Amino acid sequence: MKDDGINRREFLKGTLAGGAVATTAAVGLAPQPAQAQQKPAAASANPGYSFLNLEEAAFVEAVVDHMVPADEHSPKGTDMGLNIFIDRALAGGWGKGDRLYMQGPWKVGHPNQGYQLPLKPSELYRAGIAATNAYCKKTYSKTFDQLPEAQKQEVLVGLQGGKINFEGGLPARTFFTTMYQTVIEGMFSDPIYGGNRNKAGWRMIGFPGVVAVHAQNIDKFRDKKYTVEPLSIADLS
């Protein structure tokens, strides 16, 4: 994000430090095969959406492009495929809550106890998008994706700080941290999951990829800058 909230440097600092996200990881199960995806819900998403509807896709695209704007470090979020990564995560096992205990009892917990809601991640995302758009319509008479950048920033900072209250009691901060987490994971996950297109996230931080053995490079690059073309799972398959 830009200006008043989290700039790119602070955004990445929080990422590499582990962040403050108290939800489950979105990557861990097999990625959804491309041929199983539905007809694209929006023209800007080439591979098509499996979970997000038109309104939700517009929201997610606006969020990832605001959090990850195009600059000298990387392309914008949609060009990195972060919206596709999020859609696949929501459509897959993580979004369905496959690895979550979903039988209650449901009580308000502490942040160090992890995710405590009776909603599957996909349900949280869907409800959070609808609630955020409802707030934006009430406050600005527009949906989130229609807002200028400064107002998008106000909304995201409000969600992050828990200063926006959703009707029905859905915790805005939990929605934000879940959304923030999936943006981070989309930036730095293996491209096979839909995000980090062209390994742009890895190139930005100098990550070499999935190479498991570096012993042969210890002497070769001693006291030298280690510059290498990053390798993904697909490169080694």
Listing of model-derived features with the role each one plays in the protein:
Residues 2-3, 44-45, 55-62, 73-237:
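Mature-region segments of soluble proteins
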Residues 3-10, 25-65:
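C-terminal segment of N-terminal export signals and the immediately downstream linker at the start
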Residues 10-14, 144-147:
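Conserved catalytic-core segments centered on acid/base and nucleophilic motifs
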Residues 15-20:
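Sec-dependent signal peptide hydrophobic core
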Residues 68-69:
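Structural recognition of short helix-loop-helix hairpins that underlie histone-fold modules
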